[in-house]
Amino acid sequence: MKKILVTGGTGFIGAAISKYFCDKGYQITILDNNSRGKLKRITQSKKKIKFIFGDITKYEDVYKASRNQDYIFHLAAINGTKFFYEKPDKVLDVSCKGIINVIEAAKKLKIKNIFLASSSEVYHLPNKIPTDESEPIKIPDILNPRFSYAGGKILTELMGINNAKFFNKMIIFRPHNVYGNDMGNEHVIPEMIRKVKNAKKSIKMKGSGLQTRSFIYIDDFVEAFYLIFKKGKHLNIYNIGTQEKIRIIDLAKVIIKIFKKKNYN
């Protein structure tokens, strides 16, 4: 039975991946400090999944959790736009120390397979939509704390790529707007649902509402990741998302219709 360490495994995406691979027969260990994750996300599988409370920024915690593992899925991060602005130093601290600790522990323990979670945030405003993996990644304003998360993900990719010679598989995946049950409230879909549910006649939107997003449901995301796990190539980068675009204003209209609200602006 192959063993997999999932950092950030009680987070929304990490928990879904952990449960899916557990059901496939893999032996899963999760390293998380639950600062934003929820242990209840893996409750149904807790007899099969080993949970280690630890801090990704502490090398000793990462090293201990990594022992006897065949793969590392590195997803530990601080996500959510609110935190990018309020705690950019912490966002970068987790990203930078986390990837350094993961790579150093893997090299020392001779773990040869690492899958690194990046983000669609690294593209910022892409030149072409749909966006493929050849699109340049960028930080448009180094002084804007909004890009602390994207900067940390770019560093994660750089660390993985430039240490790839030590591994059989160093694979980077970039999730694009994943949504689903228990994703947390700091994202556009649950935030919009909350606004529509609580408002009587109208809601305020950030910006014009004409911005477009492509969303992927968590179950579809996990299946796509499993395909990358099985067939992905060393040093390849993979977007995980859909090509179906929706304007934010149209997303709001869909949610309004679901709530059956009439005479709504």
Short names for language-model regions:
Residues 1-178, 229, 248:
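N-terminal Rossmann-like NAD(P)+-binding domain of SDR-like oxidoreductases, especially those catalyzing
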Residues 45, 181-185, 244:
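Residue-level signature of the cytosolic catalytic core of signaling kinases
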Residues 17, 54, 197-265:
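C-terminal substrate-binding subdomain of Rossmann-fold SDR/epimerase-dehydratase oxidoreductases
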Residues 177, 183, 210-213:
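Heptad-repeat alpha-helical coiled-coil signaling segments
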Residues 59, 182, 215:
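Loop/helix-junction capping segments adjacent to catalytic residues or to phosphate/diphosphate-binding pockets
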